[in-house]
Amino acid sequence: MSKTNARKPIYKSLYVQVLAAVTIGVLLGHFSPELGAQMKPLGDGFIKLIKMIIAPIIFCTVVIGIAGMEDMKKVGKTGGLALLYFEVMSTLALVIGLIVVNVLQPGSGMHIDPASLDTKSIAAYTAPGKMQGTVDFLLNVIPTSVVDAFAKGEILQVLLFSVLFGFALHRFGGRGTMVFDFIEKFSHVLFDIVGIIMKVAPIGAFGAMAFTIGKYGLGSLFSLGKLMGAFYLTCLIFVFVVLGIVSRLHGFSVFKFVRYIKEELLIVLGTSSSESVLPRMMEKLENLGARKSVVGLVIPTGYSFNLDGTSIYLTMAAVFIAQATDTPMSLTQQITLLAVLMLTSKGAAGITGSGFIVLAATLSAVGGVPVAGLALILGIDRFMSEARALTNLVGNGVATLVVAKWTGDLDMQRLHQGLDQPSLQESQEPEVILDQQVAHMAVAKSHG
């Protein structure tokens, strides 16, 4: 066995390091809450490091993918199929959440009087003007300036500019070769930076978890444990049953895929942010044989439109509040709730605290269910956000592979090789694997 493929000692595995860091963070937050709460800057710092690199990585990936394509019609086809998939799956997630919360009824028997709830804590989420309309949302996709889009890290704005830049570079043909080569080399530097940042992922996961447990405590988990259990169960059903069926129909196993991205899942568990692994997910999906142009379009768009975990949360939280406050909801009202959420969940994409903003706007629009009931779930929202982020991450990964297969841009041999031999993949950093693949392609091209 070559040195490159030699398996690393277990203590050097990022998976083991993050798992240990999360465990230590939980213990510190539980036994020393005050000290645990002070660890917040460690988690925030790691997420900021990742966000620093997301916009340029999306730009390079999308531009290289589009400018290197022979058929420009494929870009529009890929985008259209991705949006169709997102709409179907997010609607399915809303429906499943609605069914499970009606069957398990986690809020039944609580008999909460809405007038007795402290609404000051939710004022920031229910203030007028927080919720975007459809027109405002679409206009917000267009940046005021390119610099502004990159400076603020607005994913959809960066994606729009990247697509236009890729189209323009493609039209230049041979005259744009120098620019194309520069962007391609620049992307390798960016992914190397990601590799450096990921070395401190355990520190970020430790800080974020210590803060969460230190501030909110394990007690808040038990006080609303029935809702927590129902929500986590629903997310598991969605990932391993719904996405499992979708994966099987497209020739791969969701169980193997989850194992393949286990390091990313652990980092998301620790940080409660699926954005913290966006660059690394893009690399790993390319390593599985998905074309760069598909990965570059589907993943960033999915982070705004394909939030399966958030969709499950929205219907379950809304009906839970109705059950807890003894507010009857007829079938017609629940169907109306579903229809409104199909629209409002898209309008709040990318907004901080979007779960509460969407819920507040939706409950107000549907009527009947007291908005004050949001105060009930505020205390456990942080813990539920972890399940949301994990489900969103797996959902976007599966979506990318499915859309790539639909458009004929998925190398099934590489997919099965990557999923069936995880030990080989784990023995190397994704950046190393990607660089090796680029080198092989360059050699093949020179011989061709």
Swiss-Prot record:
It is a multi-pass membrane protein. One of its GO terms (molecular function) is succinate transmembrane transporter activity. GO terms for biological process: L-aspartate transmembrane transport. The keyword Hydrolase does not apply. The chain crosses the membrane at residues 13-33, 49-69, 81-101, 149-169, 193-213, 227-247, 294-314, 335-355, 357-377. InterPro entries: C4_dicarb_transport (IPR023954), Na-dicarboxylate_symporter (IPR001991), Na-dicarboxylate_symporter_CS (IPR018107), Na:dicarbo_symporter_sf (IPR036458). Responsible for the transport of dicarboxylates such as succinate, fumarate, and malate from the periplasm across the membrane. Belongs to the dicarboxylate/amino acid:cation symporter (DAACS) (TC 2.A.23) family. This is C4-dicarboxylate transport protein 2. The gene is dctA2.
